[in-house]
Amino acid sequence: MGEAQLLVEDGNQKLFPCEVCGRCFATDVLERHGPICKKVFNKKRKPFNSLKQRLQGTDIPTVGKSPQPKVQPVRKSNWRQQHEDFINTIRSAKQFTLAIKEGRPLPPPPRPTSNPDYIQCPYCMRRFNETAAQRHINFCKNQTSRPVFDPIQMAARLVSRAQCKAQASLKK
């Protein structure tokens, strides 16, 4: 305690600062405070859980959620296929512009490439990623199950309705 510097003299008591926290105490109090202060400052404090504090005293049960690591599937890189598609598209565009300049017939368009990760809709044969395919297939199923109105039949019905209305007006 001799090496601690006298900080404040409060009335007739001399106060000395704590080496750990810097607060001032009398010598007899500082002897008791020192070991406790060192122990407190060396401990790691748990982060305060405000949810637990708020739910305390209520009937709402606290359910401990275990953090689940998000496992994302590792997708294989298909950059080479994309690169080849890009090169073929550029080449076909050059052939197209050259055919227009020279007046030749236009070359056939390049074949569309299909992504193997996409899912094909069984109703319209279009391809979608997984999440879009789930939504689309339900939609497309509902659309294909709806009755299709033939324009010829609709015209015939309209004519027959008009005739019925004409006959009904004549009877009145």
Swiss-Prot record:
It holds the Pfam family zf-C2HC_2. Its cofactor is Zn(2+). The keyword Signal does not apply. A zinc finger (C2HC/C3H-type) spans 14-43, 117-146. Gene3D superfamilies: Classic Zinc Finger. The keyword Isomerase does not apply. GO terms for molecular function: zinc ion binding. Zn(2+) 2 binds at residues 121, 124, 136, 140. Signal peptide: none annotated. Belongs to the ZC2HC1 family. This is Zinc finger C2HC domain-containing protein 1B. It comes from Mus musculus (Mouse). The gene is Zc2hc1b.
